[in-house]
Regions:
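Short amphipathic alpha helix immediately N-terminal
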Residues: 98-126
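Short, basic interhelical loop/turn and adjoining N-cap
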Residues: 130-153
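N-terminal interaction/assembly modules
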Residues: 1-100, 130, 152, 156, ...
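Residue-level detector of secondary-structure transition/capping positions
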Residues: 116-120, 133, 155
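Intrinsically disordered, low-complexity regions enriched in Ser/Pro/Gly/Gln/His and often acidic
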Residues: 37, 115, 141-143
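Residue-level marker of regulatory loop/turn positions in helix-turn-helix DNA-binding domains and
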Residues: 67, 104, 147
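Generic alpha-helical secondary structure signal
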Residues: 84-87, 106, 145
């Protein structure tokens, strides 16, 4: 891949990783809330009446939760702004000339949206795009190869649209 092509597709990869970071932060916050608000019998501090409130485990958890929520808000704002720009570029793929064998631009747009804007793993995309072929392992491998080929074609079309 040429350096300029790498730079042009890097926005997609950055967006995918941003979506994954958002999911991880949401999971972390849910775990902290579960520990904080469920009576699990957890010992909150080492001493019965701690003189130093900074040693209090509950305070540390609440601070950690506040930090992660702030970080989550920042990531979500960045994700929404970038998603809007990338969605416009992906929409432009439908304006490119179609392959005479069949309309593929919509499929390629779906692959880009699922993988990079929504941050889905390849197996999740395969289940969405090929829902009937779950039972056969050979079909799953074949469909996964198709997805990778479509991803390559979609990235090339994304580059063409971005250069306009």
């Amino acid at each position: 891949m040429v350096c300029t092509e790498f730079i042009e597709t890097q926005r997609l990869y950055d967006q995918m990783h941003r979506v994954q970071r958002i999911r991880k932060l949401q999971q972390d916050i849910a775990i902290i809330e579960n520990v904080l608000y469920n009576p699990s019998g957890m010992k909150w501090s080492d001493m019965p009446r701690s003189q130093n409130p900074n040693d209090d485990k509950k305070t540390k958890l609440m601070d950690d939760k506040a930090y992660k929520e702030k970080k989550l808000d920042i990531e979500k704002k960045m994700e929404q702004a970038e998603k809007h720009i990338l969605e416009k570029i992906i929409e432009d793929i439908s304006l490119l000339p179609e392959n005479p064998k069949g309309p593929m631009n919509l499929v390629l747009q779906d692959v880009l949206r699922y993988r990079y804007l929504n941050g889905y793993e390849w197996e999740e995309i395969m289940k969405l795009m090929f829902p009937d072929n779950d039972a056969f392992i050979d079909m799953a491998e074949s469909n996964l190869r198709k997805l990778h080929i479509w991803n390559g074609k979609a990235l090339m079309k994304f580059i063409k649209c971005q250069q306009k």
